């Protein structure tokens, strides 16, 4: 109908575009429309659910970039990440998703929380995630023990859809579980400092650099209060 066509035209899909990329937006579990959009590569499916989806842009906006806006209880599903938030903006000009109001994002075994969040794509896969204010990243292989990184701002860099490096800027806190050569837990380390740089391999913490007067406490596994060690803002909903 006319409303469906207006929604399609508003985000600049175009009636004659043909690709294997797919975008589906739903309201109250019923399809509004499905059409092609070059947000993702041809071997992936992006699925978005929301209550409200489009807002009429001016011509200058249409001439400069294609974009998507979704409002109220937005849910995003893609092969290498999933997300929840109240509001979302996607700009094709910089291949960036902007998540607003209590966003939560998941990728593999990691969960991302912040006041606002940006996700940058490169060739259809995650390149970077930028978390602004009250940033918290949780990582767990077994959902029993959780590596945690917290700060004012966090930048997470990805390669092949896995976190490789993470910069934590401002009031940095880290809590991670050390492993021996046989991948058995040996203890939990809690550190505070101004900034930190975290390296990952195979979805595990491989190393951390702490900057500006770090203070650390290492607790053996049998003595650790694992529930009490959860950082402020901890929510696990993978």
Task: Please name every model-derived segment.
Residues 1-238:
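Structural signature for solvent-exposed beta-strand/loop edge elements and short helix-capping sites
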